[in-house]
Structures are given as structure tokens and as C-alpha cells.
């Protein structure tokens, strides 16, 4: 997903997710104002045959942490919408049935 030709993981969570700390490895939950279903990116630093996934990083859209409701969200990638760098955008569905297009050019982690 990051464009290096090796498959990565993009995971959707619920509001009560636990994200491992990138330094200590101990899972932690976001403080209440920042809670919400979110998207995590796990870059494959290995190979297709022997994947090694880095610690999950929470996606940001236009510099803000991505949050979708309480109960959960689902995500997929696709070549839809405005494609600026040849890499897929992200489509997210939330608990209310809303669908969001997150353009790749505005995503960071």
C-alpha cells in the first residue's frame, strides 16, 4: 500500500482499540477526546514470502487523526476518486452506513 511493491496491512478498529506504543511495545488506549474507530497502517518491512510488519501507525487525514464513531469501521483501498501518485485511495464505511473517500494525497501516518 505504501508503493514499495510489498503488501502491507491496513486495519480498521473499534473505539476501544489498543495501539502498541512504538517504543515500549505496550498497548495503550487514546484519551477520551481522541477515541473513536480508526485506521491503522502496518508497513511490511520484510518480503511477500517472509513478512515483517512494523508497529501500527494511526492514519491521519489532512493532519488530523482519523476517527469514525464508536462501534467500528471498515476500510478498503481502491483506484477511485482523484489519483495523484498512482497509489490507491482509502474508502471507509462507518457504523451509520456512511461511506468516506480518503484521498491518498491527504493521508499521512
Regions found by a protein language model. Name each.
Residues 1-109:
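Beta-propeller-forming repeat regions
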Amino acid at each position: 500500500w505504501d508503493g514499495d511493491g510489498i503488501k502491507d496491512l491496513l486495519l480498521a478498529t473499534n473505539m476501544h482499540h489498543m495501539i502498541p506504543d512504538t517504543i515500549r511495545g505496550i498497548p495503550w488506549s487514546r484519551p477520551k477526546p481522541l477515541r473513536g474507530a480508526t485506521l491503522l497502517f502496518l508497513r511490511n518491512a520484510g518480503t511477500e514470502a517472509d513478512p515483517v510488519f512494523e508497529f501500527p501507525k494511526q492514519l491521519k487525514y489532512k493532519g488530523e487523526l482519523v476517527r469514525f464513531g464508536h462501534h467500528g469501521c471498515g476500510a478498503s483501498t481502491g483506484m477511485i476518486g482523484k489519483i495523484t501518485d498512482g497509489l490507491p485511495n482509502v474508502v471507509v464505511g462507518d457504523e451509520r452506513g456512511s461511506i468516506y473517500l480518503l484521498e491518498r494525497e491527504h493521508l499521512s501516518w
